[in-house]
Amino acid sequence: FTFLDEGFTAKDILDQKINEVSSSDDKDAFYVADLGDIVKKHMRWHKALPRVTPFYAVKCNDSEAVVKTLAVLGAGFDCASKTEIQLVQSIGVPPERIIYANPCKQLSQIKHAANSGVRMMTFDSEVELMKIARPHPKAKLLLRITTDDSKAVCRLSVKFGATLKTSRLLLERAKELDLAIVGVSFHVGSGCTDPETFVQAISDARCVFDMGAELGFNMYLLDIGGGFPGSEDVKLKFEEITSVINPALDKYFPLDSEVTIIAEPGRYYVASAFTLAVNIIAKKIVSKEQTGSDDEDDVNDKTLMYYVNDGVYGSFNCILYDHAHVKPVLQKRPKPDDGCYSCSIWGPTCDGLDRIVERCNMPELQVGDWILFENMGAYTVAAASTFNGFQRPTIHYVMSRPAWQLMQQIKEQEFLAEVEEQDVASLPLSCACESGIEYPATCASASINV
């Protein structure tokens, strides 16, 4: 890392990068990612959910710098495939800090998990149990149960999870196969908007624990999944959710139950850390007569169509697959007398579906101007393609020196509770490209005794 002087912010770095390419024809889209924001999120997590160990959902954003940062902080990792397991283990994360949290796995990838020492994994069907039994008899299994995800933005229970009735049958089958069922997992859906969903799911998990005890299983691990917001522009704030989860955990899984509790946050850690800068590569002015608009609120005689160099086949795939609603932010402050026009923003590909914003009001911009999109860290870079030959944006990482020092303190002490609280909200930032990042060896504070 190259640390910058005190007083710089991520926005300053973004403006600096824009200035650097302003005289060039190659005004490619790029990200600025504040890794210090991830450190702050980690501190916030442990304050709000002190009993719950985070296992970061790698699928949300698999950027190596993000994974390395969380590894140093002592987080565990929720992996869904052989490739994700390889990524996490390549940076020195021990298998005890990995859960293979995909209930439907390819047989060859189950074998890879066994050969890699990854024992914790989820299942939700008899077929999956039988697939696991032969290649991975020492697996430590969590039964994934279904939840009421009707209040989630991205629903998962239609695809994954066993009902309570089916759960007993699966536990009995696992007993016959001599497999170890060590716990229960669930996921209330991504973008959960009703914290009471967690309460019901935790209650259901308690029922399954009791079933397991009746059958002689030693169940000691509860995985409460994800569904936690990663930005502040949401109706239900993070602490509003955790204030409901904590009493439910204390009620159904009190401390003396000796149950270890983990979760699978993804967007919580990375959404707000990433800001995307896109450049206007083309512009079209459409008269009101051409649009056929009779909207009385549309007082201007034209609408504007902007074409930018990233789209729904790239970073904005989150619009299609994650139900995201992105908000454009002007890079330059408009003049007081600048008028506003009805605008739409489109991606660079030849597909007519490549639309980022259907309608918004902005001052008139020109080709070469920049538009920013905040909260772009979740389910963006991980699923971006190179359709039509358009490349993925470069990522520039920033972090403050005090945040870096705090991260080292957490690593060395291994217990977050021993780290003196620090206010890192207004710390100076540093900048480095992903390829130049070096991290010390990771700690093992998130290990689960399996």
Curated annotation (Swiss-Prot):
Inhibited by antizymes (AZs) in response to polyamine levels. AZs inhibit the assembly of the functional homodimer by binding to ODC monomers and targeting them for ubiquitin-independent proteolytic destruction by the 26S proteasome. Its EC number is 4.1.1.17. The modification N6-(pyridoxal phosphate)lysine is found at residue 59. Keywords: Decarboxylase, Lyase, Phosphoprotein, Polyamine biosynthesis, Pyridoxal phosphate. The record marks 187 as: Stacks against the aromatic ring of pyridoxal phosphate and stabilizes reaction intermediates. Signal peptide: none annotated. Homodimer. Only the dimer is catalytically active, as the active sites are constructed of residues from both monomers. This is Ornithine decarboxylase. It comes from Gallus gallus.
